[in-house]
UniProtKB/Swiss-Prot annotation:
One function term, GO molecular function aspect: lyase activity
Protein family: Belongs to the HisA/HisF family.
Encoding gene, per UniProt annotation: hisF
Keyword annotations: Amino-acid biosynthesis, Cytoplasm, Histidine biosynthesis, Lyase
Subunit comment: Heterodimer of HisH and HisF.
Keyword Ribosomal protein set for record: no
Gene Ontology terms: cellular component: cytoplasm
GO biological process: L-histidine biosynthetic process
Protein name as it appears in the record: Imidazole glycerol phosphate synthase subunit HisF
Localization in the cell: Cytoplasm
Catalytic residues (positions): 12, 131
Keyword Metal-binding: no
InterPro entries, A to Z: Aldolase_TIM, His_biosynth, HisF, IGPS_HisA/HisF, RibuloseP-bd_barrel
Function field: IGPS catalyzes the conversion of PRFAR and glutamine to IGP, AICAR and glutamate. The HisF subunit catalyzes the cyclization activity that produces IGP and AICAR from PRFAR using the ammonia provided by the HisH subunit.
Length: 256
């Protein structure tokens, strides 16, 4: 029996509001995170991902409070990321009601943190978020590099090798965002999605670039992803989660 593929709406939260940008810039307001999360829960989303994009020191308490509110009203798994740097940060988020915690920049600066987190809390609740950008030119062997700081800083790290290293350290899941595609609405970068999905034994969540339901199906069929994440197509009412599930099921994808 094939494992069901998950559909995960993503909430990018800035100072307690859901926002959506294009290529990590040009932010527009999409509403209250708890209300939006509740709507997705009612629609039958498999999980919710909540990324705190302020992640400033003053924004921390707001985030924990929002996570507490969300966890008390939403009964599907909740992954929270943004500014997670210490074991205590993870503990605080899990105590607030998160089911999984996503680590991004901190993993690049201190890979052992991922191993430490997995040992403390178990791989099942540690997600490593990877922001990848294509760095190879036409005619070259495809290569993607890891970027940090919202896609602004190159690291020199090869995305596929890095994902394998994270799995080895104990990550339970990879959240893969294509920086080239983010907010562009012309589909996932299927090359990097497939390369990483095929190289790993843990689930890969495809993110960045969904503009229609075909893109979600492509992420699974061509990108070999275990789950697909989208924001703006759901937030602004273009499509609903049930429509997405029906579309994928009609293409032979097992959904919950």
């Amino acid at each position: 029996m094939a494992l069901a593929k998950r559909i995960i709406p993503c909430l990018d939260v800035d100072n307690g509001r859901v926002v959506k940008g294009v290529k990590f810039e040009n932010i527009r307001d999409a509403g209250d995170p708890v209300e939006i999360a509740r709507r997705y829960d009612e629609q039958g989303a498999d999980e919710i991902t909540f990324l705190d994009i302020t992640a400033s020191v003053d924004g921390r308490d707001t985030t924990l409070h929002t996570v507490e509110r969300m966890a008390s009203q939403v009964f599907i798994p909740l992954t929270v990321g943004g500014g997670v740097r210490t074991v205590q940060d993870i503990r605080n988020l899990l105590n607030a009601g998160a089911d999984k915690v996503s680590i991004n920049t901190a993993a690049v600066f201190n890979p052992e943190f991922v191993g430490e987190a997995a040992q403390h809390f178990g791989s099942q609740c540690i997600v490593v978020a990877i922001d990848a950008k294509k760095v190879s030119g036409p005619g070259e062997t495809p290569r993607w590099e890891i970027f940090t700081h919202g896609g602004r800083k190159p690291t020199g790290l090869d995305a596929v090798e890095w994902a394998m290293k994270m799995e080895g350290l104990g990550a339970g899941e990879i959240l893969l965002t294509s920086m080239d595609q983010d907010g562009m609405k012309n589909g996932f970068d299927l090359g990097v999605t497939r390369a990483i999905s095929d190289a790993l034994g843990i689930p890969v969540i495809a993110s960045g670039g969904v503009g229609n339901l075909q893109h979600l199906a492509d992420g699974v069929i061509e990108g070999h992803a275990s789950a697909v994440l989208a924001a703006s197509i759901f937030h602004f009412g273009e499509y609903t989660v049930p429509e997405a599930k029906a579309y994928m099921a009609a293409r032979g994808i097992v959904v919950r």
